[in-house]
Amino acid sequence: MKRTYQPSKLVRKRRHGFRARMATKGGRGVVAARRNRGRKRLSA
């Protein structure tokens, strides 16, 4: 059986990276919420 998590740096950055977050209104909200909470890492 194939495992569900097949790591790929490229796919990770494209799907969850900072630029992917900033591309949508919802994503900008996620980054803003993480900034307000004081997260060290805002995105993948």
UniProtKB/Swiss-Prot annotation:
Residue ranges of the region described as Disordered:
24-44
Record-linked Gene3D superfamilies: 1.10.287.3980
GO biological process, alphabetically ordered:
translation
- One GO molecular-function entry: structural constituent of ribosome
Quote the biased-composition stretches of kind Basic residues, using this chain's numbering. Answer: 34-44
Cellular component, GO annotation: ribonucleoprotein complex; ribosome
Q: Which UniProt keywords apply?
A: Ribonucleoprotein, Ribosomal protein
Q: Pfam families annotated for this entry?
A: Ribosomal_L34
- Coiled-coil ranges from the UniProt annotation: none
Q: Which PROSITE patterns match?
A: RIBOSOMAL_L34
Similarity remark: Belongs to the bacterial ribosomal protein bL34 family.
Q: State the HAMAP family in the record.
A: Ribosomal_bL34
- What name does UniProt use for this protein? Large ribosomal subunit protein bL34
Q: Which organism is it from?
A: Mesorhizobium japonicum (strain LMG 29417 / CECT 9101 / MAFF 303099)
